[in-house]
Design a protein with these regions (language model features):
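Short, small-residue-biased leader/transition segments that mark boundaries at the very start
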Residues: 1-8
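Interfacial segments of multi-pass membrane proteins
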Residues: 9-12, 91, 209-224, 230-234
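Hydrophobic alpha-helical interface/terminus motif in multipass membrane transporters
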Residues: 10, 45, 66, 167, ...
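Membrane-embedded alpha-helical modules
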Residues: 17, 21-124, 228-331
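Juxtamembrane loop-helix boundary motifs flanking transmembrane segments in multi-pass membrane proteins
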Residues: 37, 58, 81, 129, ...
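Membrane-interfacial loop-to-helix junctions in multi-pass transporters
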Residues: 51-54, 78, 138-146, 175-184, ...
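Helix-loop-helix hairpins and the membrane-proximal interhelical loops
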Residues: 103-182
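Membrane-embedded helical hairpins/re-entrant loop segments and their flanking transmembrane helices
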Residues: 151-221
Length: 331
């Protein structure tokens, strides 16, 4: 995203330790935004983000990520297609447990295929220690990083809202209402603060999970918690980390093509389910401009800060929804 790009640019200026203090500032702003959402209520958010805005934003979340999937897949298209086809077959034809893990099946088949053709170097796995704790960076206070990072928060906050609505569509549950958007936003903020204080990587909502849930139909939050704990446990095993790093980019790219396309399809389904009338010129303009600004790579720069991608497009959609007069003849 544009926000992540800005973070990496500032890392070069303020150093990684200084950037960590900026992340704490981002988490703090997230917390303040969650209080605002709590104060104004769900109705306020739904007025800002009606289906005509949320639908194309979800589509954009998927399509904006598609480029990275293609770039990874094109390193070895045959291998990427093997992984993609395996995931599709497991999802459509698999039974029982096999149908619940199509992504894992695609990665395993792709990995084994790559091994068969000698495309994987197992030397780093053999040389890696069994136990290797992740390296953290001791943060340091940099007011310049803090001041810069505060406005950067706008983009990920908007993306957070879009991701929550996307997961709503996939699961059929209303997470905006229960546990509440203010709580999900606060959780994101607290995670950023903790990451900044211990010198770890920044965190945000992860769109790929939405695609995975859409494919597997597993909507129990307990599964996500188990996956999170498993990830933490695996992080201290050096050989596991090395093995995961050895997975060819093309294999992951093939899987991502399916995941990102699924997210875009969720957005299209959102427009259909909410009966968004694209025969209405107002709705057509809002949807069209959100998509063209996002896919076209439009960006606005001011004061060294860049607003682009999903953040800019969603903000544009909110603005158009508020200022364009509603049709008197069409719903």
């Amino acid at each position: 995203s544009s926000a992540a790009s800005d973070v990496y640019k500032r890392q070069e200026l303020y150093g990684l330790p200084g950037t960590m203090s900026g992340l704490v500032a981002v988490g703090t702003v997230y917390g303040l935004m969650s209080l605002l959402v709590r104060w104004r209520g769900i109705g306020f958010i739904k007025r800002l983000f009606p289906p005509v805005v949320i639908g194309p934003v979800i589509i954009l979340i998927g399509l904006s990520l598609a480029g990275s999937g293609v770039n990874m897949a094109k390193e070895n298209w045959p291998l990427a297609l093997v992984a993609l086809l395996s995931a599709i077959l497991a999802s459509m034809l698999g039974r029982g447990m096999l149908r619940l893990i199509p992504i894992f099946c695609g990665i395993i088949v792709g990995f084994l295929t790559a091994s068969l053709f000698g495309l994987i170097d197992f030397k780093p796995v053999i040389e890696a220690p069994w136990f290797a704790f992740p390296q953290f960076v001791k943060p340091s206070l940099s007011w310049e990083a803090v001041i810069f990072m505060i406005p950067v928060t706008i983009a990920p906050v908007i993306e957070h809202i879009g991701d929550v609505y996307a997961i709503n569509e996939v699961t059929g549950k209303d997470f905006v209402k229960d546990p509440g958007l203010h709580r999900t936003m606060l959780g994101d903020g607290l995670a950023c603060i903790v990451a900044g204080l211990i010198g770890g990587p920044p965190v945000t909502t992860y769109s790929e999970v939405t695609g995975a849930i859409s494919l597997t139909k597993i909507t129990d939050p307990a599964v996500i918690r188990i996956a999170a704990v498993s990830g933490i446990i695996f992080s201290v095993f050096g050989k596991v980390s090395a093995l995961l790093k050895s997975i060819p980019a093309a294999v992951l790219g093939g899987i991502m093509l399916l995941l990102f396309g699924t997210i875009a399809a969720v957005g299209i389904n959102s427009l259909i389910q909410n009966r968004t009338n694209l025969g209405d010129t107002r709705n057509l303009i809002i949807v069209s401009l959100i998509l063209t600004f996002g896919i076209g790579g439009a960006a606005i720069e001011f004061g060294g800060f860049t607003m682009a991608g999903i953040g800019l497009s969603a903000l544009l959609g909110v603005f158009l929804n508020l200022v364009l007069p509603k049709s008197k003849t069409l719903p």
